[in-house]
A protein has these predicted regions:
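Long alpha-helical rod scaffolds of large eukaryotic non-enzymatic complex subunits
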Residues: 1-469
Length: 469
């Protein structure tokens, strides 16, 4: 009787009150902007946030490179946070304007009206207990204050979208955005060409062939060699971190988020012929047959319009499956990941600081420009020592994360847990698509021997002792 009432409701009142097109429209906005389906939005938001922090540093003349908590001394206000998102929309609009023959971007315009970036208190954002998202504070990384992306839910979409759902989206967004931000900040280090390669050329004749000219070239090249050796550990660690974050991001976005969304959208529209797979999986003839079996779509019958309660229940299952596959329910993974992202921020700040110090030392040695209020030689020594320490912490954090991934893979949790009862439920009920097996990520990371974690019985050197600490 209840099923008949819901079917009758979905075929009459719901057709006018909550059409499927509006449901898919709002869910697409959440997919593109909260789940970072649009990479350009994430890049623009990260860039604008970093520019805001840099401008506040310049205003306060406070580059507390030796104090990680120094960032907290720069307090960003609510209006400035809103301005960051406004400039992000402007950057998105400018990017769209460069494509003359492109039609109006309706999802972007809808997101402009509904999406907000707000400051939140630590206790005000508590993800839904029903999906058990961990409380790791990824929202603290974008700016100097905890901020989250949220959205106004217009009526009648609030019939199936609840504030708890939006809190879950905000937590997932902060998680994905923080990983993307760390990866972007590390790759930007390679744009500092003088740090990567600096081989001074001899001056032109006749000075270049003189004894003084040759001595100057020797001095410059010796200085460049010393700096290159000082940066060698930093570049090796940064390269490994870029590889780890890049593969993790590709796994989370390309397999988990994309695959889960396609499965949910197919259920909404009633499509049964398509199977959600990543682009890499489509080109791989030897894809895991068990993974393919888990992705076999369920047959749907009858109408493909759903009543609000069915939509709400299915959407909560979708979010729960997404959070579990993203490992957001595993504090054993999210806590060391947050620590890694903090150390990467510290390492990037140190690299920029040492670059600034070396520029000042070059001016002092080559042009005679002396800053009487600064001791750059002492600062250089301090920063170089800290870079070695932080690089070791980054390496240790990555090794701990890989170990955590191996432990999660051994547990085999989340593959069927929590969704087995749905298979035996009503016909046509949404069953989350099985995506995101951790062993697929581990296979990619295994190509980097740098990530191998030694077992205790294998012995080890000083690095293993650091890990135990």
């Amino acid at each position: 009787m209840i099923a008949w009432i819901r079917l009758s409701l979905s075929q009459t009142t719901l057709q006018k009150l909550l059409p499927l097109s509006r449901v898919i429209e709002i869910l697409s906005v959440l997919r593109e902007f909260f789940l970072l389906g649009r990479g350009e939005f994430a890049i623009a938001l990260i860039s604008e946030a970093d520019e805001k922090i840099r401008s506040r540093w310049r205003q306060n003349d406070n580059l507390a490179y030796d104090n990680r908590d120094g960032l907290g001394n720069i307090v960003v206000k609510e209006g400035e946070v809103s301005a960051v998102l406004a400039r992000t929309w402007a950057a998105m609009g400018s990017l769209q304007g460069q494509q003359e023959d492109q039609e109006e971007d309706e999802p972007l315009e809808l997101a402009r009206d509904l999406v907000q970036l707000v400051i939140t208190k630590t206790t005000s954002v508590t993800p839904s207990k029903s999906i058990s998202i961990v409380s790791t504070p990824f929202r603290n990384l974008l700016l100097s204050v905890p901020v989250v992306l949220t959205m106004h839910i217009p009526s009648p979409l609030d019939l199936f979208l609840s504030p708890l759902d939006l809190q879950s989206y905000s937590s997932i967004n902060a998680y994905l955005l923080s990983i993307h931000r760390a990866h972007l900040r590390l790759t930007n280090l390679w744009k500092i060409t003088s740090l990567r390669r600096d081989h001074p050329a001899p001056p032109g004749p006749p000075y270049g062939s003189s004894t003084a000219g040759q001595n100057k070239v020797h001095t410059l090249r010796t200085r460049a060699k010393e700096r290159s050796e000082a940066m060698r550990t930093v570049w090796a660690t940064s390269s490994a971190a870029v590889f780890f974050l890049g593969e993790t991001q590709a796994y989370l976005q390309g397999e988990v988020v994309k695959g889960t969304w396609i499965g949910f959208k197919n259920w909404l529209t009633g499509e049964t012929s398509s199977r959600p797979t990543s682009s890499k999986a489509q080109d791989d003839d030897e894809e895991d047959i068990w993974l393919q079996a888990g992705r076999e779509p369920k047959a749907h019958t009858g109408s493909y319009t759903h009543d609000p309660q069915t939509l709400a229940d299915a959407h909560k299952r979708y979010l729960a499956a997404l959070a579990a596959s993203l490992l957001l329910t595993k504090s054993s993974f999210t806590d060391p990941l947050y620590h890694l992202l903090q150390q990467i921020d510290h390492l990037v700040a140190l690299v920029h600081r040492v670059h600034s110090i070396w520029q000042s030392l070059d001016l002092e040695a080559d042009e005679g420009v002396v800053d009487a209020f600064s001791d750059f030689h002492k600062e250089e020594k301090d920063v170089k020592e800290q870079m070695v320490v932080i690089a070791a912490r980054v390496k240790s954090a990555i090794e701990e994360l890989v170990k955590s991934l191996r432990d999660i893979d051994q547990e085999k949790e989340g593959w069927d847990s929590g969704f087995e009862e749905l298979v035996l439920g009503d016909e046509g009920a949404y069953v989350p698509t099985k995506v995101g097996r951790v062993d697929r990520l581990l296979m990619k990371l295994d190509f980097g021997g740098w990530f191998d974690v030694k077992k205790p019985d294998e012995g080890g050197d000083g690095e293993s002792e650091d890990d135990d600490e």
